[in-house]
Structure formats: C-alpha cells, structure tokens
C-alpha cells in the first residue's frame, strides 16, 4: 500500500533516524536506499554520520556519539515492537521513492 500526499517533514525524518539507530537489521535492510541528502537539511549531518560510521565500523553509533559529532538532538525511542519496525521499513521505502521522484522532477526542470 503506497500512501499519497504524505508530509515527509523534519519530525518524521527524525523518527526514521532514531528508529534506525535502535535496530541494526532495519538499517541494513534500508542501507541501499539510505541517502543522507534526501533528509531535511537539519538532519543531513546526523544521517551522514550514521551512514559513514556503519560503513567504517560495521556497527551503529550511539545516540551520544551522533549528537556530539553533529550537534543533533536524536533521542532513543525506547523499546519498540516488531510491528513498529515493519512500519519503518514500509514508510521509509515510500519516503525514499517520494524523494527520488522529487529529485527527478527537479532535475528535469533544470
């Protein structure tokens, strides 16, 4: 099920990053479409740090590490159920498609 006209603003993008940081399996599954440039400007530094850290150390950084390195404000969402991560995977896929389409439209306008 693909949702239309969804607002992929700062708050939901922040939730994506916070949830990815608590579940390595979900991050790995989305790593192929995880592009820090698609995130809100205020979150790009955190997204880039997470991506680079995972590539270099093959593990997720801590919230303190990301926040200290990027002056971010990511918070641990606490214990989440499997259904929460199912939502994350589905919603992040839709977000990624939306951002790819948005980029293609902007590129074609140039």
What is each PLM-predicted segment?
Residues 1-96, 100:
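Noncatalytic partner-interaction/assembly domains of nucleic-acid and motor enzyme complexes
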Residues 106-110:
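Conserved P-loop NTPase architecture
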């Amino acid at each position: 099920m693909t949702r239309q006209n969804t607002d992929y603003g700062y708050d939901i993008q922040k939730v994506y990053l916070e949830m990815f940081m608590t579940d390595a399996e979900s991050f790995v599954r989305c790593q192929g479409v995880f592009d820090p440039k698609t995130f809100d400007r205020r979150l790009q530094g955190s997204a880039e740090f997470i991506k680079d850290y995972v590539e270099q150390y093959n593990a997720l950084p801590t919230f303190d590490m990301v926040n200290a390195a990027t002056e971010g404000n990511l918070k641990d969402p606490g214990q989440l159920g499997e259904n929460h991560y199912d939502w994350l995977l589905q919603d992040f896929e839709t977000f990624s498609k939306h951002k790819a389409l948005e980029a293609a439209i902007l590129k074609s306008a140039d």
